[in-house]
């Protein structure tokens, strides 16, 4: 007879095979049709607000895995905040101006057309290009399961946003923080524009490393009489020979000891601490130190430029070091920030004889018309010919490159517009505001503090087309800038109506009060043609988005981006808000590392180690990406590879199977009718509830601390070890075998229901697709009055009392340890073919002293959790083959085949099988259950 129909076997529509890649789009379609995000916002109107402000990705190209990691991390946080009782809106944004878009539009236009196309036509082409990629990226972000106001995102090309950018700039202008100077800035000769620090990337680059002699005009006899009449040279080191035409000084450290070194018939001056190292590098063995002295008497002396017809002054600078070179630093104020500062102190001429295309101008003498830095070889050859080149070799070092074209950049002195970090104490205020912000990881505060502390003035101007203009109007005759609230209001009015294009389509008169005249008497004015640094665009988002949208607020609770944004968006936002509002635009900042390959190397198409999110989604589904994000410690660089994703997929499968087991065993459970009170549950059931309460507390705390990898670890351990390998394994018998409505079965089902309810709430921020599907299955069981229709409407579970005290905790920890030893003994018996399955076994146990008393007192619990057919105590001396535990002192275990015959229904071996004539295959327990079922059917 087949007793299968008499068992309570699991049934569920929640499939074992997830088919995430096919299933997820259907779930997304349902969320969109229901208006899930809008419903969440409507339901949360009266809740406290939590604003995570989205740092806008660039509207160019398909999203990469770094984008996916960032967006999923944000979504996990926002979903967890909603489940914690907050109103947590998400307004995604896009950065739409700037060089990368203009660069690609130029390529589409071609060489000839890009030079002749009218400015408004080119701006229209750039706007069209940005919108094209927004339309491409939006569904790619939504496919990740990211909830947000995708129908009304913020775009930096929206007219209202462009007007806000101009307003913020004009606040700086009116306050006196905006200045125009000719000073060295990063310059890309390929893109022909100035660059901000945040637009510069560092890559390995090969440069010539040369040592050059500068002839001293007057001997050093007053420094040391021994040097009288010597043919003396100051030796400098540089890796940028092309800047030598701009040299106006050689810098010494005022406190260093310097040496006059005899080399042949010449005397060379360099730092004493570097003499030996220098001579070894240049291969000179025959030398002697004639004199040592401090630099005090060297200041304001002159040496002769090695090839230009002028002198170079000897000056002091604290940034001179003895880490490399000679301690005598080539100084060109037109080609370096430190050099420029030194030049200001000494009144040196700021020479920068290089045009925007990187071509030497006539001021470069014999090198005029030549390209930088190709001219390096000519300069080196000329130095060698004149006898002033000491040594030359090539070195590989980290060098600044343009973020767009990836070509090396230069420092070049040009007239530019800057936000002064000193005017209005901007630097001081920004540094103070940094200290008021919560930084995660904590080292982020020191990082951005040191950056702001040492950063130069912010170069705002860009010599390009696609961006918001520098809304500066100045007198044609005297150059005085018009600073007027009335002008600002007119700019704002036109920008709100027509966008920033208005600056280029309207004459200057449309922005000025009627009849406006300069203080010099001139009535002719000109508009600035440069555009703003794109970092000012995104840095103004707190004003353009958070302050203007009804669903947001400034300052935001959290900014979350990659750690590179300490010198990018975080810093531009901080400076902009500090300069116009006096406070930081964020209360907290969280940063994550870069996404790298499995070996920790940067992803590169040329190397072939790029993992595209689209490929991962097609193979595994977005859920696996979400689980991967939560499994990694985002504070460091995050590794990803096919092997890692497969491991994550395996981990997901275990969690899913646990959920499926729960649902399968709840198929006949109606929580409104079948629930059993905690007080009526067995200790095992209450132990399981205690473990879930422990998990709930740990996970909710981890969400609050943004420690998502800890959540992942907790979920995996709970599902795989606590539940599947222990509790679920033990209660399988009561779930399948006991009477359908028996108290012991309904009690365990109550535990399963409550744990699953809470588990789905806890995992929903991470495994959103799976939680949504499983919740629908749970919702169908009944109790609809108390259960939210969507898991995303449900808050995290509240604390429960499992009625499981400290004494019980201690006892069960000990029981589980003993059970672990019994399992080892069963494994050995299985290996030796004594038994097959543990249900075939009789376990004989002996405990010495107090252990024996404990085992005797907990006999029923130990019997229950061991999953064997029989258990008895060892009488007398144990057999030689018995297992002696090393973990539990005094414990001896012996295993043998249990007496009796295997019951066809519960598979437990029992001596009562065969006692019934009608059901000879059943044990006495199963017989009673089946007879009860027959009676119920008859009734």
Curated annotation (Swiss-Prot):
Binding site for Zn(2+): 903, 906, 923, 926
EC number(s) from the headed UniProt entry: 6.1.1.5
Cofactor: Zn(2+)
Recorded GO CC terms: cytosol
Residue numbers binding ATP: 605
Motif 'HIGH' region boundaries: 57-67
Cofactor note: Binds 1 zinc ion per subunit.
InterPro entries: aa-tRNA-synth_I_CS, aa-tRNA-synth_Ia, Anticodon_Ile_BEm, Ile-tRNA-ligase, Ile-tRNA-ligase_type1, Ile-tRNA_ligase, M/V/L/I-tRNA-synth_anticd-bd, Rossmann-like_a/b/a_fold
Main location class: cytoplasm
Domain of life where this protein originates: Bacteria
Keywords: Aminoacyl-tRNA synthetase, ATP-binding, Cytoplasm, Ligase, Metal-binding, Nucleotide-binding, Protein biosynthesis, Zinc
Pfam families to which the protein is assigned, alphabetical: Anticodon_1, tRNA-synt_1, zf-FPG_IleRS
Catalytic activity, as annotated: tRNA(Ile) + L-isoleucine + ATP = L-isoleucyl-tRNA(Ile) + AMP + diphosphate
Residues noted as binding L-isoleucyl-5'-AMP in the record, renumbered to the chain: 561
GO biological process entries: isoleucyl-tRNA aminoacylation
GO molecular function: aminoacyl-tRNA deacylase activity; ATP binding; isoleucine-tRNA ligase activity; tRNA binding; zinc ion binding
Location(s) in or outside the cell: Cytoplasm
Family: Belongs to the class-I aminoacyl-tRNA synthetase family. IleS type 1 subfamily.
Function: Catalyzes the attachment of isoleucine to tRNA(Ile). As IleRS can inadvertently accommodate and process structurally similar amino acids such as valine, to avoid such errors it has two additional distinct tRNA(Ile)-dependent editing activities. One activity is designated as 'pretransfer' editing and involves the hydrolysis of activated Val-AMP. The other activity is designated 'posttransfer' editing and involves deacylation of mischarged Val-tRNA(Ile).
Subunit structure: Monomer.
Cited HAMAP family: Ile_tRNA_synth_type1 (MF_02002)
Family annotation (PANTHER family): ISOLEUCINE--TRNA LIGASE, MITOCHONDRIAL, SOLEUCYL-TRNA SYNTHETASE
Notes on the domains: IleRS has two distinct active sites: one for aminoacylation and one for editing. The misactivated valine is translocated from the active site to the editing site, which sterically excludes the correctly activated isoleucine. The single editing site contains two valyl binding pockets, one specific for each substrate (Val-AMP or Val-tRNA(Ile)).
Protein name per its UniProtKB record: Isoleucine--tRNA ligase
Organism encoding this protein: Desulfotalea psychrophila (strain LSv54 / DSM 12343)
């Amino acid at each position: 007879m087949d007793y299968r129909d008499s068992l309570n076997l699991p049934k569920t529509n929640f499939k074992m095979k997830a088919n995430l890649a096919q299933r997820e789009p259907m779930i997304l379609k349902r969320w969109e049709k229901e208006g899930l995000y809008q419903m969440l916002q409507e339901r949360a109107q009266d809740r406290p607000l939590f604003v995570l402000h989205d740092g806008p990705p660039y509207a160019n190209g398909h999203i990469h895995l770094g984008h996916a990691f960032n967006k999923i991390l944000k979504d996990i946080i926002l979903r967890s905040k909603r489940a914690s009782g907050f109103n947590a809106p998400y307004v995604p944004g896009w950065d739409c101006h700037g060089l990368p878009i203009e660069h690609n539009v130029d390529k589409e236009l071609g060489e000839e057309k890009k030079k002749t196309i009218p400015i408004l036509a080119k701006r229209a082409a750039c706007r069209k290009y940005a919108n094209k990629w927004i339309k491409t990226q939006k569904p790619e972000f939504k496919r990740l399961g990211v909830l947000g106001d995708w129908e009304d995102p913020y775009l930096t090309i929206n007219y209202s946003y462009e007007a806000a950018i101009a307003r913020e700039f004009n606040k700086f202008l009116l306050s006196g923080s905006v200045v125009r100077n000719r000073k060295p800035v990063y310059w890309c000769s390929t893109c022909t524009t100035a660059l901000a620090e945040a637009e510069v990337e560092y890559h390995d680059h090969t440069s010539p490393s040369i040592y050059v002699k500068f002839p001293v005009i007057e001997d050093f006899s007053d420094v040391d009489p021994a040097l009288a009449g010597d043919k003396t040279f100051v030796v400098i080191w540089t890796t940028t020979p092309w800047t030598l035409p701009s040299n106006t000084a050689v810098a010494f450290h005022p406190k260093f000891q310097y040496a006059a070194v005899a080399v042949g018939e010449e005397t060379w001056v360099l730092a004493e601490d570097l003499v030996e190292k220098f001579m070894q590098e240049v291969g000179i063995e025959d030398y002697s130190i004639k004199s040592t002295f401090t630099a005090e008497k060297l200041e304001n002396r002159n040496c002769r430029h090695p090839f230009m017809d002028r002198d170079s002054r000897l000056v002091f600078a604290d940034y001179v070091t003895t880490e490399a070179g000679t301690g005598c630093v080539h100084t060109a104020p037109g080609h370096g920030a430190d050099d420029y500062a030194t030049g200001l102190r000494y009144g040196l001429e700021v020479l920068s004889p290089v045009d925007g295309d990187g071509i030497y101008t006539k001021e470069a003498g014999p090198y005029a018309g030549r390209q930088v830095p190709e001219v390096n070889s000519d300069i080196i050859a000329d130095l060698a010919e004149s006898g002033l080149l000491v040594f030359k070799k090539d070195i590989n070092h980290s060098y600044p490159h343009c973020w767009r074209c990836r070509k090396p950049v230069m420092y070049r002195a040009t007239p530019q517009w800057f936000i002064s970090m000193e005017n209005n104490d901007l630097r001081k205020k920004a540094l103070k505001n940094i200290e008021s912000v919560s930084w995660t990881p904590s080292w982020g505060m020191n990082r951005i503090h040191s950056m702001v502390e040492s950063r130069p003035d912010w170069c705002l101007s860009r010599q390009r087309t696609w961006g918001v203009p520098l809304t500066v109007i100045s007198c044609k005759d005297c150059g005085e800038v018009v600073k007027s609230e009335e002008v600002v209001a007119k700019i704002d009015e036109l920008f709100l109506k027509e966008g920033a294009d208005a600056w280029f389509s309207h004459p200057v008169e449309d922005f000025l009060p009627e009849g406006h005249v300069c203080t010099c008497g001139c009535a002719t004015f000109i508009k600035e043609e440069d555009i703003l640094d794109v970092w000012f665009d995104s840095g103004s988002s707190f004003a353009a988005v958070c302050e203007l949208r009804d669903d947001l607020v400034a300052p935001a609770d959290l900014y979350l981006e990659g750690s590179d944004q300490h010198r990018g968006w975080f810093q531009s936002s901080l400076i902009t808000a500090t300069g116009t509002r006096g406070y930081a635009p964020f209360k907290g900042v969280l940063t994550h590392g870069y996404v790298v390959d499995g070996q920790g190397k940067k992803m590169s198409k040329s190397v072939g180690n790029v993992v595209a999110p689209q490929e991962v989604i097609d193979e595994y589904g977005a859920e696996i990406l979400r689980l991967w994000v939560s499994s990694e410690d985002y504070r460091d660089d995050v590794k990803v590879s096919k092997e890692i994703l497969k491991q994550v997929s395996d981990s997901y499968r275990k969690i899913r199977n646990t959920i499926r087991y729960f649902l399968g065993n709840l198929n006949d459970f109606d929580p409104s009718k079948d629930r059993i009170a905690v007080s009526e549950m067995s200790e095992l059931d209450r132990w399981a509830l205690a473990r879930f309460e422990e998990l709930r507390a740990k996970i909710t705390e981890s969400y609050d601390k943004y420690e998502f990898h800890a959540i992942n670890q907790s979920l995996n351990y709970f599902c795989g070890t606590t539940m599947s390998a222990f509790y679920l394994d033990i209660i399988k018998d009561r779930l399948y075998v006991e009477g359908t409505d028996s108290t012991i079965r309904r009690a365990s089902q109550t535990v399963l229901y409550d744990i699953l309810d809470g588990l789905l709430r806890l995992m929903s921020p991470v495994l959103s697709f799976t939680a949504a599907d499983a919740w629908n299955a749970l919702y169908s069981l009944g109790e609809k009055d108390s259960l939210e229709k969507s898991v995303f409407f449900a808050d995290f579970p509240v604390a429960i009392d499992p009625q499981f005290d400290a004494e019980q905790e201690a006892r069960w920890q000990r029981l589980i340890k003993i059970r672990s030893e019994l399992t080892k003994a069963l494994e050995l018996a299985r290996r030796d073919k004594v038994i097959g399955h543990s249900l075939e076994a009789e376990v004989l146990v002996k405990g010495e002293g107090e252990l024996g008393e404990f085992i005797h007192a907990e006999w029923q619990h130990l019997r229950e959790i061991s999953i064997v057919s029989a258990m008895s105590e060892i009488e007398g001396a144990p057999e030689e083959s018995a297992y002696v535990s090393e973990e539990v002192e005094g414990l001896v275990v012996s295993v043998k085949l249990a007496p009796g015959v295997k019951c066809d229904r519960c598979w437990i071996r029992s001596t009562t099988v065969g006692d019934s004539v009608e059901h000879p295959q059943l044990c006495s327990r199963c017989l009673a259950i089946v007879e009860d079922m027959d009676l119920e059917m008859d009734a």
